[in-house]
Design a protein with these regions (language model features):
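Helix-to-loop junctions at the C-terminal end of transmembrane segments
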Residues: 76-90, 177-178
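Multi-pass alpha-helical transporter architecture, strongest
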Residues: 187-208
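C-terminal ends and interior cores of transmembrane alpha-helices
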Residues: 98-115
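Short amphipathic helix-loop junctions that connect adjacent transmembrane helices
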Residues: 46-62
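Juxtamembrane intracellular "pre-TM" segments in multi-pass secondary transporters
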Residues: 2-31
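Intracellular juxtamembrane helix-capping segments at the cytosolic ends
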Residues: 132-147
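A late C-terminal transmembrane helix in Major Facilitator Superfamily
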Residues: 149-178
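Hydrophobic core of transmembrane alpha-helices in multi-pass small-molecule transporters
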Residues: 117-134
């Protein structure tokens, strides 16, 4: 009786695995969405805490703000999941992406207004809820591109792609904030987030 040998792990197996993922219809267009959808958020969100520190916020005050807004972000993710089931992938990414862009741009209102605790909490809560909604929509579409029995590896690759450009942009946000100022940086981040929705539109129109 001939025993079928399992394919040994190695670079060749890995390349064949991911080639199958990338050869799916519409996958290259989806990668362009992954690379760009969170760019505005990555650019702006990294500078929220430094901006508040520059306006006199203590570590304890920032910790409390982070805790409360993180809980709001979880709530936003739950709400986004419910709305995603009704709206579908395309409309969810557009709507939640628009809210995400508005949320990060609204941080410009906090420049010079760090002493207004109520305003800081209101805008930060809105931004985190919008971020949670947009993230869950993005992850849901990522799961739809995962192949049966390869979900873990396929999702991991997409997550790495999503973080690749966003991580580079986020790392440069400090230099841009010094050059442009906080207000301009947040407005630019919102504009980038809004502009990148055109990539979402193009991808889904091509997939129709």
């Amino acid at each position: 009786q001939q025993v079928e040998q399992a394919e040994s792990p190695g670079p060749g197996l890995l390349l064949r695995h991911y080639r199958g993922l990338l050869q799916q219809p519409g996958m290259l267009g989806w990668i362009s969405v992954l690379l760009t959808f969170k760019l505005g958020d990555a650019l702006g969100s990294a500078m929220v805490k430094p901006m508040l520190v520059d306006q006199g916020w203590s570590n304890s005050a920032l910790g409390q703000l982070t805790l409360i807004t993180s809980l709001a972000g979880i709530g936003g993710a739950l709400l986004g999941g419910l709305l995603y089931a009704r709206l579908g992938a395309y409309r969810s990414l557009l709507l939640f992406g628009l809210l995400q862009a508005a949320g990060i741009a609204s941080m410009a209102l906090l420049v010079g207004a760090g002493g207004d605790t109520l305003l800081v909490y209101a805008i930060s809560l809105f931004e985190q809820i919008a971020d949670g909604m947009s993230t869950v929509a993005l992850f849901a579409v990522m799961m739809s591109y995962c192949r049966a029995e390869h979900e873990g590896a396929d999702f991991t690759l997409q997550a790495c792609v999503q973080l690749l450009l966003a991580g580079l942009v986020g790392a440069s946000s400090g230099l841009l904030a010094q050059w442009l100022g906080y207000s301009t940086l947040f407005l630019l981040a919102g504009l980038i987030g809004l502009t990148m929705l055109a990539v979402v539109q193009r991808h889904f129109r091509r997939c129709q």
